[in-house]
C-alpha cells in the first residue's frame, strides 16, 4: 500500500479512505489481488514487483509513461506477460509510452515508431515496419544484422558487422560519418518521407540515401 499510495500522498490527492480505494483499483488494474495490499515487497516475485511499479506509475493518471528497460531483468515468459499488460493498459487508458529498450524483439512487439540512438544522438527514426524492412543508417543496419536467427547452422558474421558499421560515429561511411575534426560537414536529420528520418550530411539527397 505504501509504495503505490506515495504519489497520491506527495500530491495531496484525496483522503486516506480515497487512497485505499484507489490503490485497490490500481492493483486490480495491473492484475494483482487487492488482498496483497499489506504484503511486504520481498514477498513478491519479479513480475509482481514490476506490476506494482506500473500501478504506482499510474496512480496520478498520466497520459505519458517513460518505460526504461521495463522487462530486461525478467524471465522471457514474465516479459511477455508484462508487455501484454502494457499493451492492454495502453488500449484501456489511452496511454502513450516512451519505451527504452536494447531488445529489438521487444521493440518490434511494443513500438509504433522507433528512434535509434548511438553515442547520445538520434541516428534514425521511422515507423516500426519501415525501420525493420528498410533501415538506412549503417548503425541501424548493424543492430538488425546482429540479431541472431534461431538456426544453429547460421552463424553470425561478426567481421561483416564491424565493417564501417561500428558504434563509433567516426568509422561510419560517408555521408553518415561524424568526425570531430571536420568543421565543415554539417550533420543533421534528413527527411526521407513517410515520417522516416536519418542523420547524415545535410547535403546528401534523400533519394541517394534510400537507394
Stretches found by the model and what they are:
Residues 40-44, 48:
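Conserved ABC ATPase signature
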Residues 18-35, 144:
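Conserved ABC ATPase "signature" region
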Residues 54, 82:
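Hydrophobic anchor residue at the start of the ABC signature
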Residues 34, 128-210:
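Charged, flexible cofactor/metal-binding loops and thiol motifs
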Residues 59-63:
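A short, proline-enriched helix->beta-strand linker immediately N-terminal to the Walker B motif
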Residues 107-109:
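A short, surface-exposed alpha-helical micro-motif characterized by mixed small hydrophobic
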